[in-house]
Amino acid sequence: MALTNTTITSWKLQEIVAHSSNVSSLVLGKSSGRLLATGGEDCRVNIWAVSKPNCIMSLTGHTSAVGCIQFNSSEERVVAGSLSGSLRLWDLEAAKILRTLMGHKASISSLDFHPMGEYLASGSVDSNIKLWDVRRKGCVFRYKGHTQAVRCLAFSPDGKWLASASDDSTVKLWDLIAGKMITEFTSHTSAVNVVQFHPNEYLLASGSADRTVKLWDLEKFNMIGSSEGETGVVRSVLFNPDGSCLYSGSENTLRVYGWEPDRCFDVVHVGWGKVSDLAISNNQMIAVSYSHTNVSWYVVDLNRVKKSGSVIQGLIQDKPIPAPSSALGTTLRRNYERPTTSCTGQEMKQSSEADRRSPEGERRSPSSEDEKEDKESSAEITNPEDYKEIFQPRSVISRTPPKTTEPFPAPLEHSFSESVLEKPGPVVKIVTPVIDRAGQLKGPITSSTPVQRVEPTVIAAAPRPVAVVTTSASSPSRPVVNTTKPKPSTGIILSTRNEPIGLNAGDFLSHARNAKASAMGDEEALAQIRKGHDTMCVMLSSRSKNLDSVRSVWASGDVKTSLDSAVSMNDLSIVVDVLNIINLKPSLWKLDLCTSILPQIEELLQSRYESYVQTGCMSLKLILKRFWPLISDTLNAPPSVGVDITREERHQKCKACYKQLKNLSNVVKNRAEQVGRHGSTFRELQLLMAPLDY
């Protein structure tokens, strides 16, 4: 039988390893649907472009796991809350931190930006909600009323109300200007995970762990609809941009709801597991979920999803169902009145007055401690090309991120008969999209290959990719031509890589055999496989013996002798292993260690291996922070009267350290010109070593 190809409704777009430790939170940019922020237990916030394998930017500064993230409406800023209760706000276009906000006593569990002003709201596990003025760097008002963690916050489109969902099974509506609660919805029987305002009308949707989605009338403050039949906890809800229907995301399922009367238009089974966020772009729904260190993107073609009462074979054309005899709320319900100007301080006047009455006194001016925290935060651009394309476009009037994106093409779904499984299938044409640097799709590439099943690729996230190759095709029938020039190699071998060094995977692909070539014999094949194995065994055995020797000295409690032993072995890998342990416990550092290890640090900073460079930078940073004041004071002190052997020994050690640090300053200065994470680290070291030039 012939092979039948049909376009599918939903598919997995991509899966990546987003963090070095477990992912703890993520969010999609709702404006473009093409930007993703992920937070992890590694205390980092990583920024991604949907469908691109490499991280664009990595934001650091938090000292505990990131509990919640949110973009603003223009996707130019991102705020992240940590488990320690602190908030950090970054400007993505300027690649710098704007604010560090402190005040919550427990972890941040929800965030949202005000749609028209420099305000943001945060909810915490401590059950409090706080409204922050980013410009004043302080808390404007605190809303109290929930008894358990606040899981979701949402501002109304006109910016006058704030809705909050909590583990206490309630949804509360707050008046921002009056600074008080308007009403409370209590129909849910379990924790409420998400709330969402209708884009135009006075409606509010909520999704709960009780497996229901409820709709609330914000004029009469009553429930007008409740879903039935959800198979799992409702983790995300989203109104269609035109407000015609409501999407609900639960475990492996997307449902489409209407209201007045209540009805479920469609159910789409998607293998996304526990979906975390939804966004709509180009009539496609982009969904994300995470598990451990992995993040997965999914796409649902909304053209093939039923969003009303009529359906036509193939693509679904939405037509409104006949209106019932009673007037529908969708035609008579009040709409939001959006102000033409941005939210000003006058609108929040009452809230500011309430802040003055607040017993906490959280409104404060920037202090030296805040400035120190801001300096400790950084934005590491790990993919400069994508960063400039998305956040720093050449045209001043273009939006950021770009809004004119093409929809993701759906893969082909193959239907096989039993006879097809018994013999090789016919050759079919697979259409592969080509994605340019802006994340937009170019013309497809057509290739003829026998394909059984196409699965998405799991891509490990590298802090800095070795090379970025962009392919383009002018027509479907033309072969792909690599139009980009290869970047000059930095000579650094990344510590996080997904292929062995010096091994070309293409050598293992099948090639056309030369007719004159003779088949390789069994003995020759085994010899080829074992080539290099004996050398590797000897090297690993030697390294194991060296580590055992260092460990035996370390067990006696003599750190200096064990480090000298590692240095004498003339093996940088042993030195790196010992330094990594000492760096974890800075109290082990002594001035004696500095004189022994500084020459080794110079070698580490010039190494080809990223892990060696990182260890060397960390060790040098600790030495400068802990011992530079002592070295400087000792060398600048006037000569003492009499003989002081201890002081003389200390003076000689400080003099030796100073000489070695001067040599290292030239290495650091040359390395500071690099781009990306290493460049920022060396520039930080250059600042710490600035006193050496005086």
UniProtKB/Swiss-Prot annotation:
SMART domains in the cross-refs: WD40
Entries under PANTHER family matching the protein: KATANIN P80 SUBUNIT, KATANIN P80 WD40 REPEAT-CONTAINING SUBUNIT B1
Protein name: Katanin p80 WD40 repeat-containing subunit B1
UniProt feature, compositional bias: Low complexity: 470-481
Biased composition, class Polar residues, residue ranges: 327-349, 482-492
Locations listed in the record: Cytoplasm; Cytoplasm, Cytoskeleton, Microtubule organizing center, Centrosome; Cytoplasm, Cytoskeleton, Spindle pole; Cytoplasm, Cytoskeleton
Gene Ontology terms describing biological process: brain development; cell division; microtubule depolymerization; microtubule severing; midbrain development
Top-level division of the source organism's lineage: Eukaryota
Family annotation (PROSITE patterns): WD_REPEATS_1, WD_REPEATS_2, WD_REPEATS_REGION
Keywords (A to Z) from UniProt: Cell cycle, Cell division, Cytoplasm, Cytoskeleton, Microtubule, Mitosis, Repeat, WD repeat
Biological source species: Danio rerio
